[in-house]
């Protein structure tokens, strides 16, 4: 039986639900045995709360979930120098705001072997507890870089990296030749309501369209960004 958590430790974990406190401490919180076990091999574990050292009430107090998962862990955030190999397929997120969408996208990238995601500064925090929960441990294998996105994309474009963007005026991505090289480049996915920003849109070298079906008939105005990401990545990996 491990030593029972102190009131100060319980209060500390609760405080980490706020981004400013996570940033100040350089830590993040994960919940649930499966997610925690996935992350333990990739991040330094600082604290683990479980029925062995915390009461059900204390776990509920520390949890950010409606239904606590029984275990809560605090991990140290990785130090990142925002360097990444350019000879690979990467994803870029331009202002994706919803934590659930971001978590799903990170998990989808893990499934399709995307190891690096470039995020604009206004994209949701990948260490938000809701994001961490939605990734189901994928953060152990997918690196998330918060960058000046227009600048980063411009530098990649100068190095002759293909910049793909999902746009309504884009080319049907299933057409032959729409994607010259499926193994390299950057795919940009935009904000839930506004899509890709004007500044970033100007850097797209290969605009792509996910066609609706049947062609020419009225459909929903747009796809959820998480679903759209999965559709695009599936085509790139096909």
Label the model's feature ranges.
Residues 1-4, 53-55, 142-152, 208:
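Short acidic-hydrophobic, aromatic-tinged amphipathic segments that line or gate anion-handling sites
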Residues 1-50, 123-124:
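Boundary-proximal intrinsically disordered activation/regulatory segments immediately upstream
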Residues 73, 111, 126, 133-138, ...:
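Structured adenosyl-cofactor binding patch, chiefly the S-adenosyl-L-methionine
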Residues 86-170:
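RNA substrate-binding interface of SAM-dependent RNA methyltransferases
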Residues 165-220:
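Active-site/ligand-binding-proximal alpha/beta "capping" segment
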């Amino acid at each position: 039986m491990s030593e029972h958590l102190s009131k100060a430790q319980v209060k500390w974990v609760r405080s980490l639900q706020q981004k400013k406190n996570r940033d100040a401490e350089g830590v993040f919180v994960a919940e649930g045995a499966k997610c925690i076990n996935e992350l333990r091999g990739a991040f330094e574990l600082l604290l683990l709360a479980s029925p062995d050292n915390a009461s059900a009430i204390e776990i509920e107090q520390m949890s950010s979930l409606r239904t606590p998962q029984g275990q809560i862990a605090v991990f140290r955030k990785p130090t990142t120098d925002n360097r990444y190999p350019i000879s690979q397929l990467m994803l870029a997120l331009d202002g994706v705001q919803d934590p659930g969408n971001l978590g799903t996208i990170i998990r989808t990238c893990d499934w399709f072997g995307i190891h690096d995601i470039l995020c604009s500064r206004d994209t949701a925090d990948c260490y938000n507890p809701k994001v961490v929960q939605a990734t189901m441990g994928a953060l152990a294998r997918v690196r998330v870089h918060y960058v000046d996105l227009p600048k980063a994309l411009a530098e990649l474009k100068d190095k002759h990296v293909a910049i793909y963007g999902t746009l309504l005026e884009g080319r049907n991505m299933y057409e032959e030749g729409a994607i010259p090289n499926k193994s390299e480049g950057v795919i940009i996915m935009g904000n839930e309501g506004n899509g890709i920003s004007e500044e970033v849109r100007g850097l797209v070298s290969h605009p792509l369209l996910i066609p609706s079906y049947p062609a020419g008939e009225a459909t929903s105005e747009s796809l959820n960004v998480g679903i759209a990401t999965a559709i695009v990545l599936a085509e790139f990996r096909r």
